[in-house]
Structures are given as C-alpha cells and as structure tokens.
Amino acid sequence: MTTMATQGAWLRMTSSAKSMTKSTVTSKELGFLTSQLSGLRISYTPSDVINRISLPSFPGIQPIVARRICPFTGKKANRANKVSFSNHKTKKLQFVNLQYKRVWWEAGKRFVKLRLSTKALKTIEKNGLDAVAKKAGIDLRKK
C-alpha cells in the first residue's frame, strides 16, 4: 500500500511528463531562474567552421620582454645543477652576461645601441662589427 505522499509525488510526475511532451520546460520547473547556457552557441553552421579555418592563426602573444639570448652569438641560459654540501642537486639557470652597449658602426658612420653578450663584444673587437653582424644575419641599418 502506498501512502498519500508517494501517490502525490507519482501524480505530479505523470502530470509533468504529460506537460513536457506538449510544451517546453520552463525555468521554474527546472528549479533555476535563468538558463545556465544563456549566451552560449551550441551549434555551428558550416560557414562558421570555414571562417574559423580560413582565419590566420597567430601563435600565442609573447610579452614584450627582452629575451635573454645574445643575437650575435646565439648564447642562451644554461640549466645547471646547484650542488649542496650533502650532494643534493637542484636545477638553476645560469644566464648569459648580456650588456647594453653603444658600438661605433664604421660603415654607417654612427653609433648603434645593441644588447649583446660580453663574449660577442670581444668577438666584435677582434673581427669588427660588420663581419660579426653579417655572420649572425643581423641588419644594422634597422637599429
């Protein structure tokens, strides 16, 4: 034998099932006031897919920060082990010794402000700015 509470719930379920077949479910019946999917497009048309494919894809936007790489030598940070007294090793970065330096460019008859490693500075003193820039593929006219 069923009690009145369970019979009432069963009657409500059958009446709501009939109303669902006839019309759409309202937000009051679902138990929340606004739709959780409001503002979202669930279906796409073929033109949307074509537009997304045909758009040029750009790599992730890099922050405007000077990278710690020497443009002349290609030197970059080295991952090294920091070894403690107990021989416990932890990784650390050994950065390149980059310096901002104004270098005289003889062919352009002017100073060029560069960010280069101290090793590149020694190489420029030995071989000349034009030779080192040409080998690295750097156009000094832009700087």
UniProtKB/Swiss-Prot annotation:
InterPro entries on file: Ribosomal_bL28 (IPR026569), Ribosomal_bL28/bL31-like_sf (IPR034704), Ribosomal_bL28_bact-type (IPR001383), Ribosomal_bL28_sf (IPR037147)
Any one Pfam family match given in the protein's UniProt record, by short name: Ribosomal_L28
Subunit organization: Part of the 50S ribosomal subunit.
Protein localization: Plastid, Chloroplast
Keywords, comma-separated and alphabetical: Chloroplast, Plastid, Ribonucleoprotein, Ribosomal protein, Transit peptide
Transit peptide: 1-66
Superkingdom, taxonomy of origin: Eukaryota
PANTHER family tied to this protein: 39S RIBOSOMAL PROTEIN L28, MITOCHONDRIAL, LARGE RIBOSOMAL SUBUNIT PROTEIN BL28M
GO molecular function terms attached to this record: mRNA binding; structural constituent of ribosome
Protein name listed in UniProt: Large ribosomal subunit protein bL28c
Matching NCBIfam families: L28
Keyword Ribosomal protein: yes
Stated family: Belongs to the bacterial ribosomal protein bL28 family.
Disrupted-gene phenotype: Seedling lethality. Albino seedlings unable to grow under photoautotrophic conditions.
Predominant place of localization: plastid
Gene Ontology cellular component terms for the protein in this record: chloroplast; chloroplast envelope; chloroplast stroma; endoplasmic reticulum; ribonucleoprotein complex; ribosome
Organism of derivation: Arabidopsis thaliana
